[in-house]
Amino acid sequence: MTCKIIGCGGYLPSKIVSNDELAKFVDTNDEWIRTRTGITQRHIAGDTEYTSHLALKSAEKAIADAGISVNDIDLIITCTTTPDNSFPSVASKLQGYLGLTNIPSFDLQAVCAGFVYGLQVANSLISSDKYKTILLIGAEKMTSLLDWNDRTTCVLFGDGAGSVILQRSSDDSGLIDSNIFSSGADYDEILYTNGGVSMNGISGKIVMQGQKLFRHAIEKMQQSIKDLLHANQFSVSDIDYFIPHQANIRIINKLAELLNIEEHKVVKTVDKHANCSAASIPLALSTLKASGKIKKGDILLFSAIGAGLTWGSAFIRW
């Protein structure tokens, strides 16, 4: 028994900031950003537009795409590292916005790997036969964590949300397999925020060692994917679309090169979305689905890495 995606939806705030606009108040330029990251623009939420609002917009699109009633949902999981409040959870607020009562809802925090983590958790819950329809969301207001004086990080991130509706599969479609990992030994030497509720009462700002993260991303995502391929007796040629975490075009291209995944199979949205953390994969999936390219039976590969470090991959048959 496994879960399948029956609907998806993405939402990006209306405000778009190009590299040239960013260069007006940050010591950077369009060429510097594009050549190092592949990013040309990012969407930025307004001051009163919170993660829960982004989540709601994407959830409504996913519900409509799935053709279900909101009342069919019996569990909500929101993957985020930028909640509106310390508590309640974004998922709880979203449940209220949707008018749902007496169903469980919770947030899952695995940063950029959140959606892959959430997919495995949701699949386990559907496989338990306790839940039939799960709303799984990746939603982030990453710009709230940026130090706009640090050009090595502030140029990388954007805001947005992506949602999927999951139900039990009655055929061979759905989640084929997934793996998730973490390693917290050297978190403060790679990627973290310099604050937190129990540390100093503030959320802090993103601190990142880019070269170290690049090396870890290539090594760990590549091994995660190879493990899945081996475990399921798949070859790279079986993959129809590769949807990696949209962190940096160099990471995406290097992974595709090392794994011998053909260029036309690699989904890239980092140029327009920037790094939306847990929202990046479901946003990219929604973009791909809207293009009309996916057909039934296609094999999709998701893979992500985030702070922690957390990482993992998943195979889905559409």
Curated annotation (Swiss-Prot):
Keywords: Acyltransferase, Cytoplasm, Fatty acid biosynthesis, Fatty acid metabolism, Lipid biosynthesis, Lipid metabolism, Multifunctional enzyme, Transferase. It catalyses: malonyl-[ACP] + acetyl-CoA + H(+) = 3-oxobutanoyl-[ACP] + CO2 + CoA. One of its GO terms (biological process) is fatty acid biosynthetic process. InterPro entries: ACP_syn_III_C, ACP_syn_III_N, FabH, Thiolase-like. The keyword Iron-sulfur does not apply. It is found in: Cytoplasm. It comes from the Bacteria. The last Arg residue of the ACP-binding site is essential for the weak association between ACP/AcpP and FabH. Belongs to the thiolase-like superfamily. FabH family. PANTHER family: 3-OXOACYL-[ACYL-CARRIER-PROTEIN] SYNTHASE 3, BETA-KETOACYL-[ACYL-CARRIER-PROTEIN] SYNTHASE III. Homodimer. Catalyzes the condensation reaction of fatty acid synthesis by the addition to an acyl acceptor of two carbons from malonyl-ACP. Catalyzes the first condensation reaction which initiates fatty acid synthesis and may therefore play a role in governing the total rate of fatty acid production. Possesses both acetoacetyl-ACP synthase and acetyl transacylase activities. Its substrate specificity determines the biosynthesis of branched-chain and/or straight-chain of fatty acids. HAMAP family: FabH (MF_01815). This is Beta-ketoacyl-[acyl-carrier-protein] synthase III. It comes from Rickettsia rickettsii (strain Sheila Smith).
